[in-house]
């Protein structure tokens, strides 16, 4: 059976699940729409659903399911003729992040580089999406102790792209928190420099242009453990409380 499904409806429903932090509903949503996409033969819709599944299973630490969905999504990129397109880059970034998360950093770097080439071909390098690529790639480089390259990418993402285009205070905060880890990993005596970076991250976390939505709650939950790690427990607890309040209201 060939047809098309309403993929924007799927995204809206899945976003609603994540805004409530309802992982059970998110899983059911993904499974339902994956089945619909397969039954209708809508490969483009299936690619979107599988890409969301990759992120979901990574988030819930389901290694086998994440890698299986990732493998099929990469096959669909080729089948649909998207290897040099921005839509293909999105799949590569998600796959690379997943490989890195599950300890396959070198394989992940190869896909980050493929994604970067897509952005370069499309002249799309001064964008939020490209900054997100650099942020994720920097995390992988840091895990491999390639500190100079990681710092280069985090600085480019935060200082040279996100600050320039504006409106992404949460993502800048995440970049700074990761930069604090890099600084400490490279030199465990660099307390003063780490504190300065975290102070700047805290300012961005509390920026007036932050919309107090599910994405903001995600930023808070992502940053809180790092503040705990660096013994800034009061700020970490404050972030967790605000995130909890946001999720409870939705």
Question: What are the roles of these predicted feature ranges?
Answer:
Residues 39-42, 79-83, 121-125, 163-168, ...:
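Short coil/turn linkers that connect adjacent helices within long alpha-helical scaffolds
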Residues 11-21, 45-59, 86-101, 128-143, ...:
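Conserved alpha-helical positions within TPR/SEL1-like repeat arrays
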Residues 23, 43, 63, 70, ...:
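TPR-repeat structural position
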Residues 81, 96, 123, 165, ...:
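Short coil/turn linking the two alpha-helices of tandem helical-hairpin repeats
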Residues 155, 199-203, 227-249:
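TPR/TPR-like (Sel1-like) alpha-helical repeat modules
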Residues 1-51, 56-62, 250:
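Flexible inter-repeat linkers and adjacent short helices
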Residues 31-36, 74-79, 113-121, 155-163, ...:
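Amphipathic alpha-helical segments of tetratricopeptide repeats
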